[in-house]
């Protein structure tokens, strides 16, 4: 039945979160409040694994599936839209993009994000990267709100020149 529900959602235009439905079902079934969070996690994990199997049957690469399904806030429709956009654009095969983001990840992987104080940016390349990242964030948010998954997937590539310039000039 789970795969049937997921297939209905994948084939529809419905972009809904299943979490409120799961919570309402637990209330109707009189699940004790102290057990609801644990049960909710188990049900969501069960649905996520079934969705993963559907994507694997469609030969979506494991790393693409793992990336998407690591965000438990995604609806089935969002996951489907992003899978299609990622497969159409294959940003994971863009060597320059992967290298730039790997360098950035290695720089910040042990840092806890607390925000950016733009007054501390001294080098032009830092300022350019911050401005580009701010615009990219806005573009990504607007594309996400519009349901334009291709545009969401295209945003990271727009930062590559600023990332590369940052590493050339600052690092």
Across the structure, where does each feature detected by a protein language model lie?
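Amphipathic alpha-helical "coupling" segments that flank catalytic cores
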Residues: 1-171
């Amino acid at each position: 039945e789970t795969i049937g529900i997921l297939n209905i959602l994948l084939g529809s235009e419905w972009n809904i979160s299943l979490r409120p439905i799961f919570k309402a079902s637990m209330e109707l079934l009189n699940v004790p409040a102290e057990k609801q969070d644990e049960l909710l996690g188990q049900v969501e994990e069960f649905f996520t694994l079934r969705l993963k199997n559907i994507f694997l049957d469609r030969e979506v690469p494991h790393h693409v599936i793992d990336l998407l399904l690591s965000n438990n806030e995604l609806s089935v429709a969002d996951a489907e839209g992003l899978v299609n956009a990622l497969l159409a654009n294959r940003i994971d095969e863009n060597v320059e993009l992967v290298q730039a983001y790997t360098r950035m990840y290695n720089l910040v992987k042990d840092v806890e994000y607390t925000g950016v104080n733009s007054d501390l940016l001294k080098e032009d390349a830092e300022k350019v990267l911050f401005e580009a990242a701010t615009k990219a964030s806005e573009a990504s948010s607007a594309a996400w709100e519009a349901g334009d998954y291709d545009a969401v997937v295209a945003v990271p590539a727009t930062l590559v020149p600023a990332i590369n310039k940052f590493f050339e000039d600052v690092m």
